[in-house]
């Protein structure tokens, strides 16, 4: 169950707690203060996966308002983050694109993170979630959380 934080606090603060993990929305104004803390983790993600983006792309997308950043905290310690972009298909269907999901190795926020994402889109016009990965281990984890493979992309650089 999702418990919004901040009772008695500023209503503009968006945060939710699930199974001891708090997910906090980072506003465009807060981004410049938060970015230095996540930039090294964004670099880790690009090194592990063949990402077609660089950390500065994330900063620009969140700053523009087209993308949302949520930080995760466990026991009041930074545990990871989600970078999310709502997408519209040509048919008008809306999808939540999980651009980047990161959990610090010493924390396991995936169960709470998927539950957070499920609850985040409830009551919206978003009909599904998707992410891309070239890492084969994600096929097992994705299936466990209700995701299914839709397509496989192969690329050859020329």
Question: Model-found features: residue ranges?
Answer:
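Active-site rim helix/loop that mediates acceptor-substrate recognition in acyltransferases
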Residues: 48-67
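Acyl-donor binding region in acyl/amide transferases
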Residues: 91-145
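Active-site/acyl-donor-binding loops of N-acyltransferases
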Residues: 4, 10, 131-158
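Conserved donor-binding loop and adjoining core beta-sheet/short helix segment
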Residues: 64-107
């Amino acid at each position: 169950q999702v418990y919004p934080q901040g009772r008695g606090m500023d209503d503009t603060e968006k945060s939710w707690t699930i199974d001891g993990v708090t997910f906090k929305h980072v506003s465009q104004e807060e981004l410049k203060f938060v970015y230095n803390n996540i930039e090294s983790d964004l670099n880790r993600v690009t090194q592990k996966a063949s990402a077609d983006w660089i950390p500065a792309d994330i900063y620009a997308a969140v700053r523009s308002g087209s993308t949302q950043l949520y930080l995760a905290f466990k026991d009041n310690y930074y545990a990871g983050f989600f970078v999310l972009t709502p997408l519209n298909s040509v048919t008008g269907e809306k999808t939540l694109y999980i651009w980047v999901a990161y959990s610090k190795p010493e924390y396991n926020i995936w169960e709470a993170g998927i539950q957070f994402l499920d609850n985040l889109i409830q009551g919206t016009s978003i009909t599904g979630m998707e992410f891309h990965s070239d890492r084969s281990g994600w096929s097992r984890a994705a299936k466990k959380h209700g995701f299914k493979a839709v397509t496989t992309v192969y690329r050859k650089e020329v």
